[in-house]
Amino acid sequence: MYPGKVYRGVKEIRGSLLIVDGIEEAAYDEVVKIYGKDSRERFGRVLETSIGQAVVQVLGDREGLETDTLLKFTGSTFKIRVSEDVIGRVFNGRFEPIDGLPPILSGELREITGEPINPISREYPHDFIQTGVSAIDGLFSMVRGQKLPIFSVSGLPHNLLAAQVARQATVRGEGEQFAVVFAGIGLRKTEAEFFLEQFRETGAIERLVAVLNMADDPAVERLMTPRIALTVAEYLAFDLDMHVLVIMSDMTNYCEALREVSSARGEIPGRLGYPGYMYSDLATIYERAGVIKGKKGSITLFPILTMPGGDLRHPIPDLTGYITEGQIFLSQEMYAQGIYPPINILPSLSRLMKSGIGPGKTREDHRYLADQLYDAYSRGVKARDLARIIGEIGLSERNRRFLKFAEEFENKFVNQGFYENRSIEETLDLGWQVLSILPEEELVRIPQKIIEKYHPKYRS
């Protein structure tokens, strides 16, 4: 009934961990098939090995497992079957269907561990992805193949933003195929229901693959979920020539699971108890995104993480910032003012933006307009800080203009509806409309010929 080498008996059961003695050969991350008294097949992964002993983490249901449990060590790591049929499907964190449809039976078996893209094989990202969110498209443009994270804080609407981007994101150009892979990591039930409702009601599910790991699932499953999502994305991008946007929420839950598993293995902890290899572990995930020379498809990564205590120096955001190509911050202050999405403009950055905008990609005025909006808004924020000290009446006429600009910029440009999908042309035109509050002589970062072509005063 159980082909291959099978071990009967478990020395100890600690929650979802099985301690097995008398093991001759076992490897870290090896898949183990587990059979209880009901003969039902379960799966586990080897967390730790030593001479004659192995620690196995059970994936999924643990009911009915006792000390006389049967374990079969398969000799391979976790694999999933991928094909074009994955599009439109919803899976759990072990890639088992949870949408009432049958499992994927045809296609290729792929190991989920994967490999980062060889730097020599990489092509520099240079094509624009439209999210429909003005603050992102206009000021921190996302480029195909980029790794652009959202740095948030618990209580802010990062899940709303993730759902909106998943619904609205698209690539420009005829004949370009686009798909979204959504990885929910450590989601609460209400969060998972929200995402599924959004994807199904808006029709986004038709071009989307969802891999949902729940908060009550084993920690080791959270370590698998982003890798499963990226394995699916690699197949769609590099085998089917699609442009794939991978959204991961919340990577903080992934890092917490990494710390939990590391502690269970008895490893020496690093900063705040996180393993010393967390940086390289995150890199094995993030560096799977990109564009490969000679391949038509691309993988763009949009991870979302909540900074514990809002601390940017916490190991999770700190290490993430070294790997990714920019970051977008969400602001508690702007959220309290009723602004959605509450994107904190001044500390946010997209390092690859300039390669993905301009003539033939977005519009010739995009770069100049973004620079001017950022500059004017920073002056407006300084004027607001000054007004808090001396009062608005004490400001110069120039500072009052910039203060008014900052308010209009936040309320009209940054602020937009959850179901409002703005094209890049609408975003840029709106930017010019807000800039028209300022005198033309203040637009020092825009060439005169661009002003005369796009400024509302000349266009009207």
UniProtKB/Swiss-Prot annotation:
Top-level taxon: Archaea
Name of this chain's protein: A-type ATP synthase subunit B
Major localization class: membrane
Function recorded in the entry: Component of the A-type ATP synthase that produces ATP from ADP in the presence of a proton gradient across the membrane. The B chain is a regulatory subunit.
GO biological process, one term: proton motive force-driven plasma membrane ATP synthesis
One Pfam family recorded for the sequence: ATP-synt_VA_C
Species, as recorded: Thermofilum pendens (strain DSM 2475 / Hrk 5)
PROSITE patterns for this protein: ATPASE_ALPHA_BETA
Presence of keyword Membrane: yes
Lipid bilayer topology: Peripheral membrane protein
Cellular component per GO, a single term: plasma membrane
